[in-house]
Amino acid sequence: MSTHFIDGSWVTGAGEPFASRNPVTQAVVFEGRAASEEQVDAAVAAARGAFAAWRDRGLEERAALVKRFAGVLGEHKARLADVIGLETGKPRWEALTEVQTMIGKIDVSLMAWRERTGERQAEAGDATAVVRHRPHGVVAVLGPYNFPGHLPNGHIVPALIAGNCVVFKPSELTPRVAEETARLWEKAGIPAGVLNLVQGGRRTGVALAGHPGIDGLFFTGSSGTGNALHRQLAGQPEKILALEMGGNNPLIVQDVANTEAAIHHILQSSFISAGQRCTCARRLLVPATPEGDALLGRLVDAASRLKVGRYDDAEQPFMGAVISLAAADRLLAAQARLVSLGGEVLLEMRRLEEGTALLSPGILDVSAIKELPDEEHFGPLVQVQRYGSFDEALSLANRTRYGLAAGLISDRRELYERFWRESRAGIVNWNKPLTGASSAAPFGGVGSSGNHRPSAYYAADYCAYPVAGLEAAAVALPGQLAPGMRLNS
Protein backbone atom coordinates (compact mmCIF):
# COMPACT_ATOMS: atom_id res chain seq x y z
CA MET A 1 0.00 0.00 0.00
CA SER A 2 1.51 3.33 -1.07
CA THR A 3 1.25 5.44 2.06
CA HIS A 4 4.34 7.67 1.96
CA PHE A 5 4.63 10.77 -0.21
CA ILE A 6 8.29 11.32 -1.07
CA ASP A 7 9.58 13.66 -3.79
CA GLY A 8 6.16 13.88 -5.42
CA SER A 9 5.54 10.12 -5.59
CA TRP A 10 3.53 7.69 -3.48
CA VAL A 11 5.62 4.78 -2.27
CA THR A 12 5.14 1.69 -0.13
CA GLY A 13 6.82 1.61 3.25
CA ALA A 14 9.81 -0.65 3.81
CA GLY A 15 9.58 -0.69 7.62
CA GLU A 16 7.50 -2.58 10.13
CA PRO A 17 3.76 -3.06 9.53
CA PHE A 18 1.27 -0.96 11.49
CA ALA A 19 -2.42 -0.15 11.40
CA SER A 20 -5.00 2.22 12.80
CA ARG A 21 -8.47 1.20 13.98
CA ASN A 22 -11.76 2.89 14.59
CA PRO A 23 -11.83 3.32 18.37
CA VAL A 24 -15.40 2.05 18.67
CA THR A 25 -15.79 -0.81 16.19
CA GLN A 26 -12.07 -1.72 16.06
CA ALA A 27 -12.40 -2.01 12.27
CA VAL A 28 -9.12 -1.39 10.45
CA VAL A 29 -9.02 2.14 9.01
CA PHE A 30 -5.44 2.12 7.75
CA GLU A 31 -2.95 -0.65 7.11
CA GLY A 32 0.57 -0.23 5.81
CA ARG A 33 4.26 -0.30 6.57
CA ALA A 34 6.26 2.37 8.31
CA ALA A 35 8.93 4.35 6.51
CA SER A 36 12.39 2.86 6.90
CA GLU A 37 15.41 4.95 7.84
CA GLU A 38 16.41 4.92 4.18
CA GLN A 39 13.01 6.32 3.21
CA VAL A 40 13.34 9.03 5.85
CA ASP A 41 16.73 9.82 4.27
CA ALA A 42 15.06 10.01 0.86
CA ALA A 43 12.34 12.35 2.14
CA VAL A 44 14.87 14.72 3.72
CA ALA A 45 17.00 14.62 0.56
CA ALA A 46 13.94 15.39 -1.57
CA ALA A 47 13.09 18.36 0.62
CA ARG A 48 16.66 19.63 0.45
CA GLY A 49 16.71 19.27 -3.32
CA ALA A 50 13.46 21.22 -3.69
CA PHE A 51 14.34 23.96 -1.22
CA ALA A 52 16.20 26.51 -3.36
CA ALA A 53 13.58 26.58 -6.10
CA TRP A 54 10.72 26.79 -3.60
CA ARG A 55 12.41 29.59 -1.65
CA ASP A 56 13.09 31.53 -4.84
CA ARG A 57 9.53 31.32 -6.14
CA GLY A 58 8.68 34.31 -4.00
CA LEU A 59 5.93 34.93 -1.50
CA GLU A 60 3.09 35.49 -3.95
CA GLU A 61 3.57 32.14 -5.69
CA ARG A 62 3.84 30.32 -2.39
CA ALA A 63 0.75 32.14 -1.09
CA ALA A 64 -1.15 31.17 -4.23
CA LEU A 65 -0.34 27.51 -3.59
CA VAL A 66 -1.63 27.50 -0.01
CA LYS A 67 -4.75 29.37 -1.16
CA ARG A 68 -5.35 26.64 -3.75
CA PHE A 69 -4.98 24.12 -0.95
CA ALA A 70 -7.65 26.00 1.02
CA GLY A 71 -9.94 25.73 -1.98
CA VAL A 72 -9.29 22.00 -2.34
CA LEU A 73 -10.00 21.54 1.38
CA GLY A 74 -13.32 23.29 0.91
CA GLU A 75 -14.23 21.03 -2.01
CA HIS A 76 -13.39 17.89 -0.02
CA LYS A 77 -14.46 19.06 3.43
CA ALA A 78 -17.12 16.42 3.98
CA ARG A 79 -14.89 13.53 2.93
CA LEU A 80 -11.93 14.64 5.06
CA ALA A 81 -14.21 15.19 8.05
CA ASP A 82 -15.57 11.68 7.61
CA VAL A 83 -12.04 10.24 7.62
CA ILE A 84 -11.17 12.26 10.74
CA GLY A 85 -14.27 10.98 12.53
CA LEU A 86 -13.70 7.41 11.40
CA GLU A 87 -10.09 7.30 12.59
CA THR A 88 -10.29 9.40 15.78
CA GLY A 89 -13.85 8.67 16.91
CA LYS A 90 -14.75 12.37 17.24
CA PRO A 91 -18.31 13.28 16.19
CA ARG A 92 -18.85 14.34 12.62
CA TRP A 93 -19.91 17.87 13.66
CA GLU A 94 -16.60 18.34 15.43
CA ALA A 95 -14.60 16.87 12.56
CA LEU A 96 -16.29 19.32 10.18
CA THR A 97 -15.34 22.14 12.53
CA GLU A 98 -11.74 20.93 12.44
CA VAL A 99 -11.60 21.04 8.64
CA GLN A 100 -13.16 24.50 8.60
CA THR A 101 -10.51 25.63 11.09
CA MET A 102 -7.82 24.26 8.77
CA ILE A 103 -9.23 26.42 6.00
CA GLY A 104 -9.59 29.55 8.12
CA LYS A 105 -6.12 29.36 9.59
CA ILE A 106 -4.55 29.64 6.13
CA ASP A 107 -5.66 33.27 5.90
CA VAL A 108 -4.38 33.84 9.44
CA SER A 109 -1.00 32.41 8.43
CA LEU A 110 -0.77 34.68 5.40
CA MET A 111 -1.73 37.70 7.48
CA ALA A 112 0.84 36.77 10.13
CA TRP A 113 3.64 36.51 7.58
CA ARG A 114 2.92 39.97 6.25
CA GLU A 115 2.42 41.58 9.66
CA ARG A 116 5.10 39.86 11.72
CA THR A 117 7.81 38.99 9.22
CA GLY A 118 8.13 39.82 5.53
CA GLU A 119 10.37 42.82 4.80
CA ARG A 120 10.84 46.14 6.62
CA GLN A 121 12.85 49.19 5.51
CA ALA A 122 13.89 52.44 7.20
CA GLU A 123 16.23 55.24 6.17
CA ALA A 124 19.48 55.27 8.15
CA GLY A 125 21.55 58.27 7.06
CA ASP A 126 23.11 57.56 3.68
CA ALA A 127 21.90 53.94 3.73
CA THR A 128 18.70 51.95 4.06
CA ALA A 129 18.25 49.65 7.04
CA VAL A 130 16.51 46.51 5.83
CA VAL A 131 15.14 43.50 7.69
CA ARG A 132 14.23 40.50 5.59
CA HIS A 133 13.29 36.98 6.63
CA ARG A 134 14.93 33.86 5.35
CA PRO A 135 13.50 30.33 5.66
CA HIS A 136 15.39 27.78 7.70
CA GLY A 137 15.47 25.22 4.90
CA VAL A 138 14.13 21.75 5.67
CA VAL A 139 11.88 21.44 8.71
CA ALA A 140 10.32 18.36 10.26
CA VAL A 141 6.74 18.49 11.52
CA LEU A 142 5.55 15.90 14.03
CA GLY A 143 1.78 15.95 14.51
CA PRO A 144 -0.66 14.73 17.17
CA TYR A 145 -3.72 12.51 16.93
CA ASN A 146 -6.32 14.72 18.62
CA PHE A 147 -6.53 17.21 15.72
CA PRO A 148 -4.73 15.26 12.99
CA GLY A 149 -5.71 17.67 10.23
CA HIS A 150 -5.77 21.08 11.88
CA LEU A 151 -2.74 21.01 14.18
CA PRO A 152 -0.09 19.67 11.76
CA ASN A 153 -1.24 22.16 9.14
CA GLY A 154 -0.84 24.88 11.75
CA HIS A 155 2.89 24.20 11.35
CA ILE A 156 3.02 23.09 7.70
CA VAL A 157 1.21 26.06 6.15
CA PRO A 158 3.33 28.80 7.81
CA ALA A 159 6.49 26.82 7.06
CA LEU A 160 5.61 26.62 3.37
CA ILE A 161 4.61 30.28 3.17
CA ALA A 162 8.01 31.22 4.60
CA GLY A 163 9.79 29.17 1.91
CA ASN A 164 10.73 26.04 3.84
CA CYS A 165 10.31 22.50 2.62
CA VAL A 166 8.66 20.04 5.00
CA VAL A 167 8.95 16.41 6.04
CA PHE A 168 5.78 15.52 7.94
CA LYS A 169 5.52 12.57 10.30
CA PRO A 170 1.99 12.24 11.75
CA SER A 171 0.86 10.26 14.78
CA GLU A 172 0.86 6.54 14.11
CA LEU A 173 -2.73 6.57 15.43
CA THR A 174 -4.02 8.77 12.58
CA PRO A 175 -2.12 7.80 9.41
CA ARG A 176 -5.24 7.74 7.22
CA VAL A 177 -6.02 11.40 7.93
CA ALA A 178 -2.42 12.33 7.12
CA GLU A 179 -2.54 10.43 3.83
CA GLU A 180 -5.84 12.05 2.83
CA THR A 181 -4.46 15.50 3.67
CA ALA A 182 -1.27 14.92 1.68
CA ARG A 183 -3.34 13.83 -1.31
CA LEU A 184 -5.22 17.12 -1.09
CA TRP A 185 -1.90 18.99 -1.12
CA GLU A 186 -1.06 16.99 -4.23
CA LYS A 187 -4.36 18.04 -5.84
CA ALA A 188 -3.47 21.66 -5.04
CA GLY A 189 -0.26 21.28 -7.07
CA ILE A 190 2.43 21.12 -4.40
CA PRO A 191 5.79 20.79 -6.21
CA ALA A 192 7.73 17.55 -5.80
CA GLY A 193 9.82 17.48 -2.64
CA VAL A 194 8.28 20.58 -1.05
CA LEU A 195 6.03 18.50 1.21
CA ASN A 196 6.93 14.92 2.06
CA LEU A 197 4.98 12.47 4.21
CA VAL A 198 6.62 9.64 6.15
CA GLN A 199 4.40 7.37 8.24
CA GLY A 200 5.24 5.17 11.19
CA GLY A 201 5.76 4.96 14.91
CA ARG A 202 8.56 5.79 17.30
CA ARG A 203 11.38 4.45 15.12
CA THR A 204 10.35 6.64 12.19
CA GLY A 205 9.98 9.67 14.45
CA VAL A 206 13.40 9.17 16.03
CA ALA A 207 15.01 8.80 12.60
CA LEU A 208 13.43 12.03 11.37
CA ALA A 209 14.05 14.09 14.51
CA GLY A 210 17.69 13.01 14.64
CA HIS A 211 18.37 13.44 10.94
CA PRO A 212 21.38 15.70 10.29
CA GLY A 213 19.69 17.07 7.17
CA ILE A 214 16.86 18.90 8.93
CA ASP A 215 17.20 22.53 10.01
CA GLY A 216 14.44 22.48 12.58
CA LEU A 217 11.50 20.63 14.06
CA PHE A 218 7.97 21.70 15.03
CA PHE A 219 6.10 19.39 17.38
CA THR A 220 2.65 19.21 18.93
CA GLY A 221 1.97 16.34 21.30
CA SER A 222 2.59 14.92 24.75
CA SER A 223 5.11 16.30 27.20
CA GLY A 224 6.83 12.92 27.36
CA THR A 225 7.57 12.90 23.63
CA GLY A 226 8.40 16.60 23.64
CA ASN A 227 10.94 16.14 26.42
CA ALA A 228 12.49 13.24 24.50
CA LEU A 229 12.82 15.45 21.42
CA HIS A 230 14.39 18.21 23.50
CA ARG A 231 17.01 15.75 24.75
CA GLN A 232 17.57 14.34 21.27
CA LEU A 233 18.28 17.77 19.79
CA ALA A 234 20.30 19.01 22.76
CA GLY A 235 23.61 20.59 21.81
CA GLN A 236 22.38 21.60 18.35
CA PRO A 237 21.68 25.34 18.67
CA GLU A 238 21.76 25.68 14.90
CA LYS A 239 18.37 23.94 14.71
CA ILE A 240 15.08 25.61 15.57
CA LEU A 241 13.07 23.43 17.96
CA ALA A 242 9.53 24.51 18.83
CA LEU A 243 7.48 22.35 21.17
CA GLU A 244 3.76 22.51 21.97
CA MET A 245 2.94 20.06 24.71
CA GLY A 246 0.28 19.19 27.25
CA GLY A 247 -1.06 20.75 30.40
CA ASN A 248 -2.55 20.02 33.81
CA ASN A 249 -4.84 22.99 33.42
CA PRO A 250 -6.72 24.61 36.34
CA LEU A 251 -10.15 26.23 36.14
CA ILE A 252 -11.21 28.27 39.19
CA VAL A 253 -14.84 29.09 39.99
CA GLN A 254 -15.69 31.81 42.52
CA ASP A 255 -18.54 34.29 43.01
CA VAL A 256 -20.54 33.73 39.84
CA ALA A 257 -24.25 34.53 39.64
CA ASN A 258 -25.10 32.76 36.37
CA THR A 259 -24.66 29.18 37.52
CA GLU A 260 -26.09 27.69 34.34
CA ALA A 261 -23.52 29.50 32.19
CA ALA A 262 -20.78 28.44 34.59
CA ILE A 263 -21.87 24.79 34.28
CA HIS A 264 -21.81 25.09 30.49
CA HIS A 265 -18.30 26.54 30.50
CA ILE A 266 -17.05 23.82 32.87
CA LEU A 267 -18.52 21.06 30.70
CA GLN A 268 -17.12 22.62 27.55
CA SER A 269 -13.72 23.09 29.19
CA SER A 270 -13.52 19.56 30.57
CA PHE A 271 -15.26 17.21 28.17
CA ILE A 272 -15.20 18.65 24.65
CA SER A 273 -13.37 16.27 22.29
CA ALA A 274 -13.75 13.62 25.02
CA GLY A 275 -11.24 15.63 27.04
CA GLN A 276 -8.59 15.21 24.34
CA ARG A 277 -7.59 18.84 23.90
CA CYS A 278 -4.35 20.03 25.41
CA THR A 279 -6.22 23.04 26.83
CA CYS A 280 -8.97 21.02 28.53
CA ALA A 281 -9.52 21.69 32.22
CA ARG A 282 -7.93 18.86 34.20
CA ARG A 283 -8.46 20.41 37.62
CA LEU A 284 -11.61 22.23 38.72
CA LEU A 285 -11.12 24.46 41.76
CA VAL A 286 -14.37 25.08 43.65
CA PRO A 287 -14.86 26.91 46.97
CA ALA A 288 -15.51 24.72 50.02
CA THR A 289 -18.85 26.42 50.69
CA PRO A 290 -22.54 25.50 50.39
CA GLU A 291 -22.56 27.41 47.09
CA GLY A 292 -19.67 25.25 45.91
CA ASP A 293 -21.54 22.11 46.95
CA ALA A 294 -24.59 23.22 44.96
CA LEU A 295 -22.47 23.97 41.89
CA LEU A 296 -20.89 20.52 41.99
CA GLY A 297 -24.28 18.88 42.37
CA ARG A 298 -25.56 20.59 39.26
CA LEU A 299 -22.32 19.86 37.40
CA VAL A 300 -22.50 16.14 38.15
CA ASP A 301 -26.11 16.02 36.99
CA ALA A 302 -25.36 17.86 33.74
CA ALA A 303 -22.22 15.82 33.01
CA SER A 304 -24.11 12.56 33.55
CA ARG A 305 -26.51 13.59 30.79
CA LEU A 306 -23.88 14.37 28.14
CA LYS A 307 -24.48 12.21 25.09
CA VAL A 308 -21.57 9.93 24.18
CA GLY A 309 -21.63 7.96 20.95
CA ARG A 310 -20.24 6.98 17.59
CA TYR A 311 -18.87 9.60 15.23
CA ASP A 312 -21.57 8.98 12.63
CA ASP A 313 -24.63 8.59 14.86
CA ALA A 314 -27.68 10.20 13.29
CA GLU A 315 -28.32 12.04 16.55
CA GLN A 316 -24.88 13.50 17.03
CA PRO A 317 -23.23 13.03 20.44
CA PHE A 318 -21.38 15.71 22.39
CA MET A 319 -18.50 13.30 22.98
CA GLY A 320 -17.11 10.54 20.84
CA ALA A 321 -14.61 7.88 21.82
CA VAL A 322 -11.10 8.46 23.04
CA ILE A 323 -8.46 7.56 20.48
CA SER A 324 -7.87 3.88 21.30
CA LEU A 325 -8.57 0.99 23.64
CA ALA A 326 -5.15 1.51 25.19
CA ALA A 327 -5.94 5.17 25.89
CA ALA A 328 -9.25 4.18 27.50
CA ASP A 329 -7.47 1.59 29.64
CA ARG A 330 -4.93 4.17 30.82
CA LEU A 331 -7.67 6.61 31.80
CA LEU A 332 -9.62 4.00 33.75
CA ALA A 333 -6.41 2.97 35.50
CA ALA A 334 -5.69 6.62 36.36
CA GLN A 335 -9.16 6.96 37.88
CA ALA A 336 -8.64 3.83 39.96
CA ARG A 337 -5.27 5.08 41.17
CA LEU A 338 -6.67 8.45 42.23
CA VAL A 339 -9.45 6.70 44.14
CA SER A 340 -6.87 4.47 45.86
CA LEU A 341 -5.01 7.61 46.96
CA GLY A 342 -8.12 9.03 48.60
CA GLY A 343 -10.14 10.55 45.76
CA GLU A 344 -13.93 10.55 46.05
CA VAL A 345 -15.98 9.56 43.01
CA LEU A 346 -18.59 12.19 42.24
CA LEU A 347 -19.31 10.78 38.78
CA GLU A 348 -17.63 7.55 37.73
CA MET A 349 -15.97 7.41 34.33
CA ARG A 350 -17.12 4.13 32.78
CA ARG A 351 -16.51 2.18 29.59
CA LEU A 352 -19.92 2.37 27.97
CA GLU A 353 -19.51 -0.66 25.72
CA GLU A 354 -17.05 -3.50 26.16
CA GLY A 355 -14.40 -3.67 23.47
CA THR A 356 -14.73 0.03 22.66
CA ALA A 357 -13.01 3.26 23.67
CA LEU A 358 -16.31 4.95 24.52
CA LEU A 359 -15.95 6.49 27.98
CA SER A 360 -18.47 8.47 29.99
CA PRO A 361 -17.39 11.70 31.73
CA GLY A 362 -15.71 11.28 35.11
CA ILE A 363 -15.50 13.71 38.05
CA LEU A 364 -13.39 12.99 41.13
CA ASP A 365 -12.98 15.08 44.27
CA VAL A 366 -9.26 14.80 45.01
CA SER A 367 -9.14 17.39 47.79
CA ALA A 368 -8.12 14.75 50.34
CA ILE A 369 -5.05 13.66 48.36
CA LYS A 370 -2.11 15.43 49.99
CA GLU A 371 0.39 14.64 47.24
CA LEU A 372 -1.73 14.89 44.11
CA PRO A 373 0.18 13.48 41.12
CA ASP A 374 0.99 16.25 38.64
CA GLU A 375 -0.12 14.35 35.55
CA GLU A 376 -2.11 15.14 32.45
CA HIS A 377 -4.91 12.60 32.07
CA PHE A 378 -5.78 13.07 28.41
CA GLY A 379 -9.46 12.26 28.41
CA PRO A 380 -12.86 12.93 30.02
CA LEU A 381 -11.67 12.93 33.64
CA VAL A 382 -11.69 16.09 35.74
CA GLN A 383 -10.33 16.39 39.28
CA VAL A 384 -12.08 18.69 41.76
CA GLN A 385 -10.08 20.55 44.39
CA ARG A 386 -11.95 22.45 47.11
CA TYR A 387 -10.39 25.62 48.51
CA GLY A 388 -10.99 28.04 51.35
CA SER A 389 -9.69 31.32 49.95
CA PHE A 390 -8.69 32.80 46.62
CA ASP A 391 -5.08 32.80 47.83
CA GLU A 392 -5.33 29.04 48.25
CA ALA A 393 -7.00 28.65 44.86
CA LEU A 394 -4.15 30.49 43.14
CA SER A 395 -1.60 28.39 44.98
CA LEU A 396 -3.34 25.18 43.92
CA ALA A 397 -3.70 26.39 40.34
CA ASN A 398 0.04 27.02 40.02
CA ARG A 399 1.02 23.77 41.73
CA THR A 400 2.07 22.09 38.49
CA ARG A 401 5.16 21.80 36.33
CA TYR A 402 2.94 22.54 33.33
CA GLY A 403 1.81 25.97 32.22
CA LEU A 404 -0.44 25.81 29.18
CA ALA A 405 -3.89 27.16 30.10
CA ALA A 406 -5.70 28.50 33.16
CA GLY A 407 -9.16 29.93 33.58
CA LEU A 408 -11.36 31.83 36.01
CA ILE A 409 -15.15 31.91 36.11
CA SER A 410 -16.14 34.84 38.30
CA ASP A 411 -18.14 38.05 38.24
CA ARG A 412 -15.33 39.89 40.00
CA ARG A 413 -12.91 41.65 37.68
CA GLU A 414 -10.46 42.36 40.51
CA LEU A 415 -10.04 38.62 41.00
CA TYR A 416 -9.27 38.20 37.31
CA GLU A 417 -6.74 41.04 37.34
CA ARG A 418 -4.89 39.23 40.07
CA PHE A 419 -5.39 35.83 38.42
CA TRP A 420 -3.95 37.08 35.12
CA ARG A 421 -0.87 38.49 36.83
CA GLU A 422 -0.14 35.46 38.99
CA SER A 423 -1.15 32.52 36.79
CA ARG A 424 1.75 30.59 35.33
CA ALA A 425 0.25 29.83 31.94
CA GLY A 426 0.49 30.87 28.30
CA ILE A 427 -3.31 31.08 27.88
CA VAL A 428 -5.42 32.73 30.59
CA ASN A 429 -9.20 32.98 30.06
CA TRP A 430 -11.90 34.79 32.01
CA ASN A 431 -15.55 33.70 31.88
CA LYS A 432 -14.94 31.71 28.70
CA PRO A 433 -14.31 27.99 28.20
CA LEU A 434 -10.70 27.08 28.80
CA THR A 435 -10.52 25.41 25.40
CA GLY A 436 -11.25 28.65 23.57
CA ALA A 437 -8.30 30.35 21.86
CA SER A 438 -8.04 32.77 18.96
CA SER A 439 -6.16 31.73 15.82
CA ALA A 440 -4.98 35.33 15.58
CA ALA A 441 -3.21 35.11 18.96
CA PRO A 442 -0.15 33.19 20.14
CA PHE A 443 -0.85 29.64 21.27
CA GLY A 444 1.39 27.79 23.69
CA GLY A 445 2.58 27.54 27.25
CA VAL A 446 5.49 27.63 29.65
CA GLY A 447 7.27 25.05 31.77
CA SER A 448 6.60 21.48 30.69
CA SER A 449 3.93 22.72 28.29
CA GLY A 450 6.41 23.94 25.69
CA ASN A 451 9.03 26.44 24.70
CA HIS A 452 7.68 28.47 21.76
CA ARG A 453 4.48 29.45 19.90
CA PRO A 454 4.96 27.70 16.54
CA SER A 455 1.33 27.68 15.42
CA ALA A 456 -1.48 30.18 14.90
CA TYR A 457 -0.55 33.83 14.50
CA TYR A 458 2.98 33.63 15.92
CA ALA A 459 4.00 30.68 13.75
CA ALA A 460 5.61 33.03 11.25
CA ASP A 461 8.21 33.95 13.87
CA TYR A 462 9.55 30.40 14.00
CA CYS A 463 9.39 29.53 10.31
CA ALA A 464 12.00 32.08 9.23
CA TYR A 465 14.86 33.98 10.79
CA PRO A 466 15.45 37.74 10.44
CA VAL A 467 18.37 39.01 8.37
CA ALA A 468 19.32 42.63 9.12
CA GLY A 469 21.34 44.74 6.71
CA LEU A 470 22.48 48.25 5.81
CA GLU A 471 22.25 48.86 2.07
CA ALA A 472 23.43 51.61 -0.29
CA ALA A 473 23.25 51.68 -4.08
CA ALA A 474 26.88 52.81 -4.45
CA VAL A 475 30.08 52.90 -2.44
CA ALA A 476 30.74 56.38 -0.99
CA LEU A 477 33.18 57.86 1.47
CA PRO A 478 31.78 59.13 4.75
CA GLY A 479 31.72 62.86 5.31
CA GLN A 480 34.54 62.52 7.81
CA LEU A 481 37.17 59.83 8.31
CA ALA A 482 37.70 58.29 11.74
CA PRO A 483 40.62 59.66 13.79
CA GLY A 484 43.92 58.07 12.82
CA MET A 485 42.76 57.05 9.34
CA ARG A 486 44.51 58.44 6.19
CA LEU A 487 43.60 57.02 2.81
CA ASN A 488 46.35 58.86 0.85
CA SER A 489 50.07 59.14 1.59
UniProtKB/Swiss-Prot annotation:
Pfam family, one: Aldedh
Function: Catalyzes the NAD-dependent reduction of succinylglutamate semialdehyde into succinylglutamate.
Reaction catalysed by this enzyme: N-succinyl-L-glutamate 5-semialdehyde + NAD(+) + H2O = N-succinyl-L-glutamate + NADH + 2 H(+)
Database matches in Gene3D superfamilies: Aldehyde Dehydrogenase, Chain A, domain 1, Aldehyde Dehydrogenase, Chain A, domain 2
Single GO molecular function: succinylglutamate-semialdehyde dehydrogenase activity
CDD domains noted in UniProt: ALDH_SGSD_AstD
UniProt name for this protein: N-succinylglutamate 5-semialdehyde dehydrogenase
Similarity field: Belongs to the aldehyde dehydrogenase family. AstD subfamily.
Pathway(s) the chain acts in: Amino-acid degradation; L-arginine degradation via AST pathway; L-glutamate and succinate from L-arginine: step 4/5
InterPro entries reported in the protein's UniProt record: Ald_DH/histidinol_DH, Ald_DH_C, Ald_DH_CS_CYS, Ald_DH_CS_GLU, Ald_DH_N, Aldehyde_DH_dom, SuccinylGlu_semiald_DH_AstD
Binding-site residues for NAD(+), renumbered to this chain: 221-226
PANTHER family: ALDEHYDE DEHYDROGENASE-RELATED (PTHR11699)
BP-aspect Gene Ontology terms: arginine catabolic process to succinate
Enzyme Commission code: 1.2.1.71
Active site: 244, 278
